[in-house]
Amino acid sequence: MIPNEKIKSIYLIAICGTGMASLAGLLQKSGYQVTGSDSNIYPPMSTLLQSSGIDIKPGYQRKNITQNIDQVVIGNAVSQDNQEVLAVQEKGIPYISFPEAINKFYLKNQKSLVVTGTHGKTTTTGLLSWVLHSAGKKPGFMVGGWMNNFDGNHAISKGDFFVSEGDEYDTAFFDKGPKFLHYNPFASILTGVEFDHADIYRDLEHVKDSFRNFVNIIHTDGFLLS
């Protein structure tokens, strides 16, 4: 994996998804040159990206993948036969998934606070971010919804904490494990577990297994609220 200090240009495939657009905003605020593509370009995410000066290329085209790209982030909805993915692989450009990118760029040297559960993640993540902000902790966060309090859905940490939503859905076409296993949780809020995502989980017990795996990687000095 390429060291962060050697990365200047980052390209996001499927940049207009809620999480990917938030990540793009974080990366740009961190000083990286950020571009990306999507086949579904529409508000509010397209407006957010364009207002930040991030170039969005419509559709997925091989010509978009150039050698000056240092790192590619591939969204969950992107398939293995995507034309840009094929170009990335042919050119040997390093690529990672969305949750891997969060870990790589924003969870190092931070206490990772992960809100997970079948329902209520976005609301709870927003509340936790606001509580920490109000307490003067200056947390980083990435939330799957727009927060009027912050006039945004992401922020770079200026303290010890980064708050994120832990999704049990699979990571990418090249990583079928749950996203939340990439977040190195120091502590977590678990809102509840129900059967969901019938396209990848057999039954409720299968879903519970994923959450058990997540709980088992919480830091030994951390905690779980449920």
Q: What are these model-derived regions, one by one?
A:
Residues 51-61, 160-163:
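N-terminal glycine-rich dinucleotide-binding loop that anchors FAD/FMN and/or NAD(P) in oxidoreductases
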Residues 1-45, 49-56, 68, 72, ...:
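ATP-dependent carboxylate-amine ligase
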Residues 3, 26-29, 63-67, 76, ...:
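Phosphate-binding loop of NTP-binding sites
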